């Protein structure tokens, strides 16, 4: 069994951060160690919430606590998602380095949560800079959306060709794999939901239906990152992991749309997470 330390937000009600990622990874047979960066009543897109950002010291303390019981070397991957403060970025990077000193084969997937194409950058002051200057160089895999693709690459991204250039620029900065979770308005077809995967071996594009909602569900990127790393840990190739992730997420979105719900219907769609009914294929473009 593979083990993942998932350092993300937690919501008591609904699905975002670790609530979106943990159960799907477990469904794929991965043991998840959930370490929460915030604990909120619900996700922030409701416009009101209660809760707190977890003190930065707790991240390192918890990781050292796992090491104290001689279990840290079992960690096969670290996932970081929504980060509540700039100080947490440094703590997470230190934790990644410490874990890799115990298990040099451990992977670090950085989901560089900064914002949304329609909302801009919405994280706390200093988080964006920490992700760009610290986390990206440590990451083996990174999973930006359109906003994050622009910020991480430092390049304008207004069309499909520029998106490919930005992905190549990020690869040159350290990560071995770049998964663009959603190309949004710079994809090839605005009526579709499009993703990119780039490695040293090339670049692949996948397109699936763009589901319409009265209110767009939150947590899709967290689900995507979790499924991708779980598939890789289970021995799937990059392309197999990419396709399974895209298809499973599409099925979750279909079930969520059918139930007309603002929250991702992860439990209702659990069978599709394990065995997607969608069969969209990745196409090599470079």
Curated annotation (Swiss-Prot):
Its cofactor is Mg(2+). One of its GO terms (cellular component) is cytosol. It holds the Pfam family Phos_pyr_kin. ATP binds at residues 111, 148, 181. Its EC number is 2.7.1.35. InterPro entries: PM/HMP-P_kinase-1, PyrdxlKinase, Pyridoxal_kinase_PdxY, Ribokinase-like. Pyridoxal kinase involved in the salvage pathway of pyridoxal 5'-phosphate (PLP). Catalyzes the phosphorylation of pyridoxal to PLP. Belongs to the pyridoxine kinase family. PdxY subfamily. Homodimer. This is Pyridoxal kinase PdxY. It comes from Pasteurella multocida (strain Pm70).
